[in-house]
């Protein structure tokens, strides 16, 4: 019953018009009025911001802010996979041979997440990792490894929340929400970086257009908090043992080891 009511409420409020109004407000000068309150409520670390709080003219500018030079360091070891974002480590685990994985009691299909069977097949038996970005986090997304970009594509239309309630009651938000996917080939092995849109504000802006990418290079940004899913081929990585669900991660921090480089 709770799940049904939750989904009904989301469907009634999560339309194009609502999203349009919220997006327009966030991009308007009027939104600057609530910036101080927003920064206080979400405890934004102002010491790391590229500009002072009063220099951001709109909420959108604050959402998509850059960091001061040198505030994040990228693990440069050739064997390391790094966190592509600042966020909360949600979960990791195996991708079954059926091209599915379980998180928070919900089964997700890689076929649904990536849009077709051919793309999903290469990740069967591999590993998934999920990182959640709250409204307080730095919203820019960077590459977790170096390699060649093999494909970029967008799927989905609406988005359910990706917070705890959304994960429990939503319609498989990680594989059904609006999402932008970048696949990267590195030394013959593939990784998919799935950028999942948040409710109301689906916008994911791609910044990287070249055929190659370097570890730590900026690739895109969210216009609000959301989630990143990383998919790796079978026998490609070993997740850092110390990582725990709920742990805060910082961009550039090592989260896994490339088995081919051990």
Curated annotation (Swiss-Prot):
Modified residues (Pyruvic acid (Ser)): 226
Major site of localization recorded for this protein: membrane
Post-translational modifications: Is synthesized initially as an inactive proenzyme. Formation of the active enzyme involves a self-maturation process in which the active site pyruvoyl group is generated from an internal serine residue via an autocatalytic post-translational modification. Two non-identical subunits are generated from the proenzyme in this reaction, and the pyruvate is formed at the N-terminus of the alpha chain, which is derived from the carboxyl end of the proenzyme.
Source organism of the structure: Bacillus cereus (strain ATCC 14579 / DSM 31 / CCUG 7414 / JCM 2152 / NBRC 15305 / NCIMB 9373 / NCTC 2599 / NRRL B-3711)
Chemical reaction(s) catalysed: a 1,2-diacyl-sn-glycero-3-phospho-L-serine + H(+) = a 1,2-diacyl-sn-glycero-3-phosphoethanolamine + CO2
Pfam families attached to this UniProt entry: PS_Dcarbxylase
Cofactor binding note from Swiss-Prot or TrEMBL: Binds 1 pyruvoyl group covalently per subunit.
UniProt GO cellular component terms: plasma membrane
Molecular function via GO: phosphatidylserine decarboxylase activity
InterPro entries (UniProt xref): PS_Dcarbxylase (IPR003817), PSD-B (IPR033177), PSD_type1_pro (IPR033178)
Taxonomy of the source species: Bacteria, Bacillati, Bacillota, Bacilli, Bacillales
Subunit organization: Heterodimer of a large membrane-associated beta subunit and a small pyruvoyl-containing alpha subunit.
Annotated GO biological process: phosphatidylethanolamine biosynthetic process
Cofactor entry: pyruvate
Name recorded for this polypeptide: Phosphatidylserine decarboxylase proenzyme
Compartment annotation: Cell membrane
UniProt site positions, description: Cleavage (non-hydrolytic): 225-226
């Amino acid at each position: 019953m709770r799940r049904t009511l939750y989904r009904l409420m989301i469907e009634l409020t999560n339309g194009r018009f609502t999203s349009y109004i919220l997006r327009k407000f966030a991009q308007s000068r009027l939104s600057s009025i609530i910036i101080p309150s927003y920064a206080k409520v979400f405890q934004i670390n102002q010491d790391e911001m590229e500009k002072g709080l009063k220099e951001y003219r709109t909420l959108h500018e604050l959402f998509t802010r850059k960091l001061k030079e040198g505030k994040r360091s990228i693990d440069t070891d050739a064997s390391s996979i790094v966190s592509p974002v600042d966020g909360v480590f949600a979960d990791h685990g195996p991708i079954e041979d059926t091209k599915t994985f379980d998180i928070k009691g919900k089964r997700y299909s890689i076929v649904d997440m990536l849009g077709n069977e051919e793309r999903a097949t290469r990740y069967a038996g591999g590993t998934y990792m999920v990182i959640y970005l709250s409204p307080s986090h730095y919203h820019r997304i960077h590459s977790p490894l170096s390699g060649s970009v093999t494909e970029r594509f967008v799927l989905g239309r609406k988005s359910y929340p990706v917070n705890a309630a959304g994960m429990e009651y939503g319609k498989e938000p990680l594989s059904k929400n609006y999402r932008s996917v970048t696949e990267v080939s590195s030394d013959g092995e593939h990784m998919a970086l799935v950028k999942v849109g948040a409710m109301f504000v689906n916008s994911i802006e791609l910044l990287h257009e070249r055929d190659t990418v370097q570890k730590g290079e900026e690739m895109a940004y969210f216009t609000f908090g959301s989630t990143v899913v990383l998919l790796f081929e079978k026998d490609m990585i070993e997740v850092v043992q110390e990582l725990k669900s709920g742990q805060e991660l910082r961009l550039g921090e090592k989260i896994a080891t490339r088995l081919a480089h051990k």
